[in-house]
C-alpha cells in the first residue's frame, strides 16, 4: 500500500533529478579520473554503492576512469605471509619479495574486486595495470626505497579506446621502466599522471578525510592553486594531505580542469560532487 510519506520521497527524488539536469548536460562526454584509496573501499556494501555510482556516471555519458590504491590490503597480506618491512625516513622499502606481494594484491585481489563490483551493478569494467600496453612508463624514485617508481610517460591510447567503446578502465598503480622492471607507484601520483595524459575534466581523489581544512578545521570547498601553495608554505596543509594536494597541482599543470579531494566513505560522494550545486569536498582549480 502506498502512503503519503512514500509519495513525498518520490517527489523529492524527482526534484533532485530535475535539479541535476544542468550538471548531467555539463558532464556528458567528459572524462573523470577517480582515485579510489584503499581506506575508501570498506565493506562489500560500500564497494557496491561506489560501483553503482560509477555505472550511473557511465549511463549518463560520463567516461569514468578508475585508479585504485590498496595499502591496507598490501599490509594485511605482508603480515599474513610474515614478510617484514623495512622503512627509510618513514617510507616503506619495496624489496623484491615485497614487490611480488604488491603486484599480486593490486593487480589480483584489489583490481578484480573493483571490476567485479562494477560488473555486478550492470557496468562493463576492464581491469588493467600501468604495465599493460605500456600505459605507464616509470623510473625508480629512490634506490634506497627499492622498487618504487615515478611516472615518466603515460600513453593514453588504450584508455581512450576503452572509454570510446563504453568500457570502464580500472587501473592498478604499477608501471615498468624501459627494461621491463616492475615498480609500485603511489596511487595518487598514478591517478594524477593518468588524468593529465587524458586531459580529464575532473580528477576526484577519494580519501578518508572530508577535504582541505583551514586552521579552524573547517573544510574549504573551493581553492586556487596559489592558495594551496600558500597554505602548504605556512603549514596549514601538512602531513598526509601534502601528497594529495601536490598530486592535484601536478594534474592541473598537466591540463586537468579541476581536482577534488573528498571523503570516499561518504555515500554517493562522486555523484554529489559532479551532479549537485554544492559538490563535495574541496575543489582546486588552476589560477
Curated annotation (Swiss-Prot):
Pathway it works in: Amino-acid biosynthesis; L-arginine biosynthesis; N(2)-acetyl-L-ornithine from L-glutamate: step 2/4
Gene3D superfamilies documented for this protein: Acetylglutamate kinase-like (3.40.1160.10)
Listed name of the protein: Acetylglutamate kinase
Originating organism: Roseobacter denitrificans (strain ATCC 33942 / OCh 114) (Erythrobacter sp. (strain OCh 114))
The encoding gene: argB
Any one GO CC term of the record: cytoplasm
Catalytic activity: N-acetyl-L-glutamate + ATP = N-acetyl-L-glutamyl 5-phosphate + ADP
The entry's keywords: Amino-acid biosynthesis, Arginine biosynthesis, ATP-binding, Cytoplasm, Kinase, Nucleotide-binding, Transferase
Binding site for substrate: 70-71, 92, 184
Any Gene Ontology biological process: arginine biosynthetic process via ornithine
Residue numbers marked as site, Transition state stabilizer: 35, 244
Function: Catalyzes the ATP-dependent phosphorylation of N-acetyl-L-glutamate.
Enzyme class, first EC level, given as a word: transferase
Plastid among keywords: no
Highest taxon in the source lineage: Bacteria
Family: Belongs to the acetylglutamate kinase family. ArgB subfamily.
Amino acid at each position: 500500500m502506498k502512503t503519503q510519506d512514500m509519495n513525498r520521497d518520490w517527489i523529492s527524488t524527482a526534484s533532485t533529478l530535475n535539479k541535476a539536469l544542468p550538471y548531467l548536460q555539463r558532464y556528458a562526454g567528459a572524462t573523470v579520473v577517480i582515485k579510489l584509496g584503499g581506506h575508501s573501499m570498506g565493506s562489500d556494501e560500500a564497494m557496491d554503492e561506489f560501483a553503482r555510482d560509477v555505472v550511473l556516471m557511465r549511463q549518463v555519458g560520463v567516461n569514468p576512469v578508475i585508479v585504485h590504491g590498496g595499502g591496507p590490503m598490501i599490509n594485511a597480506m605482508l603480515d599474513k605471509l610474515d614478510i617484514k618491512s623495512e622503512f627509510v625516513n618513514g617510507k616503506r622499502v619495496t624489496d623484491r619479495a615485497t614487490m611480488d606481494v604488491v603486484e599480486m594484491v593490486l593487480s589480483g585481489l584489489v583490481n578484480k574486486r573493483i571490476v567485479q563490483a562494477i560488473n555486478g551493478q550492470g557496468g562493463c569494467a576492464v581491469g588493467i595495470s600501468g604495465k599493460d600496453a605500456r600505459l605507464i612508463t616509470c623510473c625508480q624514485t629512490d634506490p634506497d626505497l627499492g622498487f618504487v617508481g615515478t611516472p615518466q610517460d603515460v600513453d593514453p591510447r588504450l584508455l581512450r579506446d576503452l572509454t570510446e567503446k563504453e568500457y570502464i578502465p580500472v587501473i592498478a598503480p604499477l608501471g615498468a621502466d624501459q627494461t621491463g622492471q616492475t615498480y609500485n607507484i603511489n596511487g595518487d601520483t598514478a591517478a594524477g599522471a593518468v588524468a593529465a595524459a587524458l586531459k580529464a575534466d575532473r580528477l576526484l581523489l577519494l580519501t578518508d578525510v572530508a577535504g582541505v581544512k583551514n586552521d579552524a578545521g573547517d573544510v574549504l570547498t573551493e581553492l586556487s592553486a596559489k592558495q594551496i601553495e600558500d597554505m602548504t608554505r605556512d603549514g596549514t596543509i601538512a602531513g598526509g594531505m601534502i601528497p594529495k594536494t601536490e598530486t592535484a597541482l601536478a594534474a592541473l599543470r598537466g591540463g586537468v580542469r579541476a581536482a577534488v579531494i573528498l571523503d570516499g566513505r561518504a555515500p554517493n560522494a562522486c555523484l554529489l560532487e559532479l551532479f549537485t550545486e554544492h559538490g563535495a569536498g574541496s575543489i582546486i582549480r588552476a589560477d
